[in-house]
Amino acid sequence: MNKKSILSKTSLGSLFFLFGTALSACSSATTEVISSFSSAQKYFSANKKELNKRNLVTILKDSYNSDPKSTVNSLLAGWKYSLLDQKLLENPMDPSRFSKAFGSNTKDDVNPNISEKGLYLAETYPGVSSQIAQVLGVQSQKVTGFSYSWTSKTKFEVKILIKMKGKVGSDGTSQTLIKSFLGTDSKGSGSNNQNGGVTEKDFEGDQANFDGNFIFTYTQPSDGRRLASNNFDPITGTINFPADLQIEVSTSHEKLNTLMTTNTQVGMIKNRSFKGKSFNLLPFFYYALL
């Protein structure tokens, strides 16, 4: 064997060694970034120039392929941190930061939230969903609880509690809708007798004010969809998380609670389930790191 051949093989072997070392280092760095949400915070705090949606999704996708459980738990921790610790819904909006993460300038795009969009009212009350939102008269909302457990993509649960302060019938349009509800009993006969004795006077003045509890529960999809590598899309900068959603509502207002029990239309909002949904988790993770 001549010297040229020996050198050639030696160089080739060195190249493969270096390439393998580089891949290993890259993989280790990626694992370090997503091993936990706190490690992601630490990494991007020291490497601000690397923090952009495309790069972040690429890193998370790479690590999901090698360690799905750690990656998903890191994503869920970021979701929790932005809502519960950074008080994304309660605090005044930082327009620049918010639009950078969510691509919009409205908190209606935060999931979950108590709004026409966040409550999927159009699916329950087609044609009058905006009026229903006005009936609730949301004055403020605050995330007070966030728990999650992820065993696998076929077994998980995320539960988020939002407390809100509202004012029933906060404008003329919603007052008209309340009259409509009170004019129809649970059988649709046009009598108030089935409304538990509730009348418009029960929502006048300070009696219109109430506290509400909204529980949002996300579980594995019942339609067979599962979180997979292709849900991480660097091009669009999204991480679409498939899940079924249940929204449960209770309030401090005795008469409103009565209506949710006795009136068919009002009662529809009390406990609703939605299948076939997907939720983009990237904005929360990104927002928390900005």
UniProtKB/Swiss-Prot annotation:
Residues 186-197 have a biased composition (Low complexity). A lipid is attached at residue 26 (S-diacylglycerol cysteine). This is Uncharacterized lipoprotein MG439 homolog 1. Disulfide bonds: none annotated. It comes from Mycoplasma pneumoniae (strain ATCC 29342 / M129 / Subtype 1) (Mycoplasmoides pneumoniae). It is found in: Cell membrane. It holds the Pfam family Lipoprotein_3. Keywords: Cell membrane, Lipoprotein, Membrane, Palmitate, Signal. The keyword Membrane applies. Residues 183-203 are annotated as: Disordered. Residues 1-25 form the signal peptide. It comes from the Bacteria. GO terms for cellular component: plasma membrane. It is a lipid-anchor. Belongs to the MG439/MG440 family. A lipid is attached at residue 26 (N-palmitoyl cysteine). Its main location: membrane.
